[in-house]
Each structure stands twice: as structure tokens, then as C-alpha cells.
UniProtKB/Swiss-Prot annotation:
Its EC number is 5.4.2.11. One of its GO terms (biological process) is glycolytic process. HAMAP family: PGAM_GpmA. It comes from Methanosarcina acetivorans (strain ATCC 35395 / DSM 2834 / JCM 12185 / C2A). The active site is at H9 (tele-phosphohistidine intermediate), E124 (proton donor/acceptor). This is 2,3-bisphosphoglycerate-dependent phosphoglycerate mutase. Belongs to the phosphoglycerate mutase family. BPG-dependent PGAM subfamily. The keyword Protein biosynthesis does not apply. The lineage of its organism: Archaea, Methanobacteriati, Methanobacteriota, Stenosarchaea group, Methanomicrobia. Pathway: Carbohydrate degradation; glycolysis; pyruvate from D-glyceraldehyde 3-phosphate: step 3/5. The record marks H194 as: Transition state stabilizer.
Length: 248
């Protein structure tokens, strides 16, 4: 049996300021740091093997704080496109670049080193015309019902921005290709990311309908823990888990 832990980042400066953060790189607040450390304490009994996060600092900071409690040092894994000499040949004679995953230094040189995979597929929603704007001002301009629809529905997002369906299309293939095989190898994985990229993963893992996903909200820095056994992921304490709020 192995574990999959998904964690939304701790409170950020723009959570406090009431702004749509999206892809804007906003760090944690003092409260967010404390939340991440409390999350780490909840995970002390699970020895982490591999980590995944987005390209945004608030998710990365949350991950670093969790790893610090386990006395582990994260080593970023970088994907590099191959050079001309590194290309592989397809059956039809065409060529494609081979991507290699490289560490700044070997990850197995010390027992406390742990790989960190950082990818835009796990980024928060790109909010389009709402990006960086004050939530109360946008509700006054477009109406609270419209804002809720853009932010909660599966198929429709804010103008010039992403819907949850768009996020699902980038996050779920990444999960299936990069994360699921590691769970199959019996390793414990943590994913530190964002409200909407994690909602997309929860929808996929738990088979939640397009309508019911509207009701799912994630608390800051509260772990959602799945056990993986027999090819299936099952959430622990699914009915009482305070990390996942089933309301608007």
C-alpha cells in the first residue's frame, strides 16, 4: 500500500487581500506558514518518497515547509529537451526530441534527499479578466451569481481565462502519466498545488460529476489523504474529512 496526499497551499497574501491570484506569484503569509507546518505535523507518520508541485511560489513554499518537518531536502527535477544528437527516430522516419529528467546533483547521494517535480499542469486557474482583481469589486461589477458560476462550474470559466474543464485537461493527463505510475511502484507521493488544479484531480480520482464538483472546496494547507492498493485510490475518512468542503 502507498499514499497519495494532496494539499492546497497555505494562506497567501492575496487570499487575505481578497484578490483572484491565479498565475500571479504571491507568497505565503505568516498564517500560511503556520498552516503548512500544522499540515506537516499531521503527515509525520507518512514517509514521503516523491513530491509534485506547481510553478507558483505559494505551493512550493508549502511543500518546502512540509519537507522541513520530515528533515528532507527537496531536489528539483528539470526536464530538458534533447539536442540534435539526443533525438529519437519514429517508425515513419521523422524525429522527435527526447526529454530527459535531470537533477542538479544525484538524488540518491543522501537518504534525506527527495525529488521535486514542478510543472505548470498543476498551476492554479488562469483567471483571465479577473486575474489580480479584487473579488468584491468584480462581484459588484458582474454580479455575485455570475462570479460563482465562472469559479464553480465545470464547463465555463471567466472570459479570457480557464474553466475547470480546461484545468482538468492539463492536470489529469499529467497525473496519469507522471504521478500514478509512482503510486503503482509503492511509493508515497505528495502533491502541493491549488484549489482548482486539485479539484480537477479529486473529480478524476473520485468520479465526481460535473454538477457535484461545484460543491467541492479545499481548505488551505489541509491534507487530503488517499490510500493506494489493488490499483485503486480510496480517500481516508471520506465522510468526515474537514479538508474538503461540500458546499458553495
Amino acid at each position: 500500500m502507498s499514499y497519495l496526499i494532496i494539499v492546497r497551499h497555505g494562506e497567501s497574501g492575496w487570499n487575505v487581500d481578497g484578490r483572484f491570484g491565479g498565475w500571479v506569484d504571491v507568497p505565503l503569509t505568516g498564517k500560511g506558514i503556520k498552516e503548512a507546518l500544522l499540515c506537516a505535523a499531521e503527515l509525520e507518520g507518512i514517509d514521503l518518497d516523491v513530491t509534485f508541485t506547481s510553478k507558483l511560489i505559494r505551493a512550493q513554499e508549502t511543500l518546502f515547509l512540509i519537507l522541513s518537518k520530515q528533515k528532507k531536502i527537496g531536489v528539483f527535477v528539470h526536464e530538458e529537451a534533447g539536442t540534435g544528437e539526443d533525438r529519437t527516430e519514429r517508425e515513419d522516419g521523422s524525429r522527435k526530441d527526447r526529454k530527459e529528467k535531470r537533477y542538479a546533483y544525484p538524488p540518491n547521494t543522501e537518504k534525506n534527499l527527495i525529488p521535486i517535480h514542478s510543472n505548470e499542469a498543476l498551476n492554479e486557474r488562469y483567471y483571465g479578466i479577473l486575474q489580480g482583481k479584487k473579488k468584491d469589486k468584480m462581484k459588484a461589477k458582474y454580479g455575485e451569481e455570475q462570479i460563482l458560476h465562472w469559479c464553480r462550474s465545470f464547463d465555463e470559466g471567466p472570459p479570457e481565462g480557464e474553466s475547470l474543464k480546461d484545468i482538468y485537461r492539463r492536470a489529469v493527463p499529467y497525473f496519469e502519466k507522471e504521478i500514478f505510475p509512482i503510486l503503482q511502484d509503492g511509493k508515497n507521493v505528495i502533491v502541493c498545488a491549488h484549489q482548482n488544479s486539485l479539484r480537477a484531480l479529486i473529480k478524476h480520482i473520485e468520479g465526481i460529476s460535473n454538477e457535484d464538483i461545484r460543491k467541492i472546496r479545499l481548505a488551505n494547507a489541509r491534507p487530503v489523504i488517499y490510500t493506494f492498493s489493488g490499483g485503486r485510490l480510496v480517500r481516508e475518512n471520506a465522510e468526515t474529512d474537514p479538508s474538503v468542503k461540500r458546499n458553495l
